[in-house]
Each structure stands twice: as structure tokens, then as C-alpha cells.
Amino acid sequence: MKKKTTVVVSVLAVILIAVAGAIVFKSHQDNTAQNNNQKEETKMKKLPTITLKYGDEVIGKLDGYTMAMDESLMRDVIVPISTSHKVPMAIKTQGNRIKTVKYEVKEYNNNSLVDNGTIEDWKENGGTIDLTYQASAIMEQGKEYFLKFIIETASDHEVYYYTRATILNGDKIVPNQIKFAKKFSENTFNEEKSSDVAAYLEPNSKYASDSLGQATIRSTLGMVIWKTFRPKKISDVVVSAKDIYIKDTGESGTYTLNYQIEATNAQKVKEKYNVAETVTVWTFKGKNYILAYNREVNQIWDCNENNVGNSFIDLGIQKQTTTVYKESSNQQYIAYEINGDVYVMDIIGKNIKSPYKLKAKSSETLYKTKAKVVNVDDKGNLTFIIYGYSTSGYHRGKNGISVMDYNWEKNTTTEIAFIPSDEPSQILTNEMKDLCYKGDGTV
């Protein structure tokens, strides 16, 4: 049931290193191979972040962009707005001095302007600004709108925050649905509540899987309740509202619960995992039902003797069931990506290095920023790309594709190009085959 993702080293490579005893790979995770631009991170302030609320309930967090994005593709969060048309917000300044906070509302279908203005009457207290966005009275119930906030800092930089919004026809729908989703999640950790969980599942052998990396409403009860895994939550649950629909047949809301868990493996070593649990709740005549359920689990992978062996790399429990890796033509080096972190291994020299570490602390980070290995040569030199929302200090707030070169001997990583894009990572992933190719030794 606790199926893991494993990369198997090629047969020829195994023959080349077939020596007595276990192979120990040296880890170079604290090397100088991090992106040279990361040196700038200590010099540059982080961008302000916005936390959105529905009453006292947090329903989403927005990261800022210093470039314009395609609004139609920015669907990470939707803001449910109460009948009072008020949206409580909190801005974490991250050391920036905020001059103004503006908003802009557009029609979802034709992008025409509905409302814009400036949010007044706020004060900063200890690096946090509490304020309220008042939605326009002309916004219709159940209709979806583009909503953008613009923060101007003292350095005259404008930072953009993209989301969507919809006016609700009742004030208790969202809090009750979130409470219901959280309760369902809690029940999956309690075997005594398994009958409560089973009541909402639709098991189908056609979709059966023995991997804990992903569980859905069609999975077996044992998979959903973590049967033999027995993890425990080690972080708060962070809720993000994804979709809201209001119809005559009821109201549906989709919410993602992000949190971390910890479990002990067969070697008695504690391992941590990022979890994204998405629940679609349908409310009809005051009663809640589950329309869809999806749970993704990704182990926070560490390069150690438990995960790297004689002829394999054990990537642990991951949503992805197979891992694409690149191998040098002399079959001495292999390179791969796991959860935004990039690794390259010298099979003969029994050495493994990390050219880039995303250090994702949540599934939201994994969703917005991704990595892809392009090529590794016979000397262990690597070309890879980082795409989506940039966490680099040099490109902070930008979105696009960074083309990176890694030098094995010098153990250094250098950015050779940055290509801005107004499309988020999930769209770029689908286009990556066209955007990334290998020709005469260059990207």
C-alpha cells in the first residue's frame, strides 16, 4: 500500500559499478551550486503577500507579481464575497513600505471593466496591514469576475495580485462547507471514523492503485484512511478556495487543504510530506455532500543512504508514479528532478550533487514553480530549466523560464537566460515540449 517511486539505474551502469558491498553516495546539498542569483535574495526585500478571508476564515493567500499576467489563466484562488460585499484582508509587508492599495474588477467573459478604486483607511501594525475590500453593489450574485489588487510600494514599484471573485447568496455556505471539508480530512486520520469516510466514497476497481501518492473519491477506503501508513499532521491546515458555483440545485465549493504530515519508515526514520487535499462540497437544503475528492502526497525528499542505493534512487511516496531522468551518453551520470529540486549522480564515482533546491514547504509552491532536466553530458555538466513563478531574488515576482547551466567540476550553477511568460507553470508544463528542445548542444 505504501508504494514508492523508484528510478532504476541502467543495466550497463550497474555492471560498471558492480563491486562488493553497498555503495555510499556523498551528498553535496550545502554546496555552492545554488543559482548564483540567489545571492541577491539576502539583498532584496521579499514582496508583500495578501491573505484573504471570509469572515474569520482564511480562504486564500496571494503572491505578488511584478509583471502583468494573463488573467484568464490565473485560477489559483477564488474569493467568495458575503452579502455585505465586504472582504477582510491582511497584507504582510515583508519590510516594504506600502503607499497605496488599489483594486480592479473585470467581467469574466469579455474582460470589460466593472469597477476599480483605492482601498482607504488602513494602518500598519507590526508589519501587517488589516483592511477591507468593499465589492461593488453592481456585482451580481453567482457571477464570476476577475479581481486584481495592485500594491504600490515606496520604491514606486507596482505589485499585482490575481484572483477571481463571486458574490454569494448566503453567508453561512462557505464556513459550513470548509468546516465539513476539514472534518472529513480529520476523519481520514481516525480509523474509528472510517465508516463516516466510507459513506462519501465511490470505490472503483478500474482506478485502483497501491500508491499513497494520490487518493481520490474512487479509491478504496483503506487508501483514503492511510491504513498502514499511520501519519500525523505536523502543521496547521491552510485553506484555499478554488471554485464556487451557485445554482438552483444548490451551491458547490471546492477547497484545497494544504498541510504537512510525518511518518516513520521501515528503517525507523521519520520522513515529512507535503499534502494537498482537495474537496468539492455540494450543499443542498442545508445538507453537505462530497462531489469530488483528491489527495496528493509528496515526500520531502532528502539525499541519504536510505533513499540512494546500489542501483536505484528511492524517491519515496510521490504523486508522480514515474520519474523522467536524463542519462549521459557514457552512462556515467544521471540527472533528475523531484519536487522542484534537481540532482545529478556520478554512478562510477559514487557521488551525488544538487545543482538547485526549490525547498518547497507546501504543495502550493510545487504547483507554482517547477523544474525540468534537459541534458547531462559525459562530464556531469547539466542543463535544466526552472519555470513558473520565480523564487529567485534576481527575478522576484517574475514569471517565466530560467535556463540554467551546472558545472560538475566547479560545482556551480549559472543562469544563462530568463524568458518572461504571462502563463503560469501548469500551462507552461503542457507547452514544454515545444518550448524546450535539444539541438546542436544548446537549448
Where do the protein language model's features map onto the residues?
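N-terminal Sec-pathway targeting helices
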Residues: 1-16, 23-25
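Sec-dependent signal peptide cleavage junction
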Residues: 20-43
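Beta-propeller fold detector
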Residues: 115-118, 292-293, 353-361, 412-421
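Short, solvent-exposed aromatic-acidic interface loops
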Residues: 167, 291-302, 420-423
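Core segments of small alpha/beta cavity-forming domains
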Residues: 40-102, 109-112, 147-152, 158-230, ...
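Aromatic sugar-binding surface patches on proteins
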Residues: 122-134, 365-368
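Exposed beta-sheet edge and beta->alpha loop/turn motif
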Residues: 252-290, 294
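Surface-exposed, charged secondary-structure patches
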Residues: 72-88, 100-107, 112-119, 132-149, ...
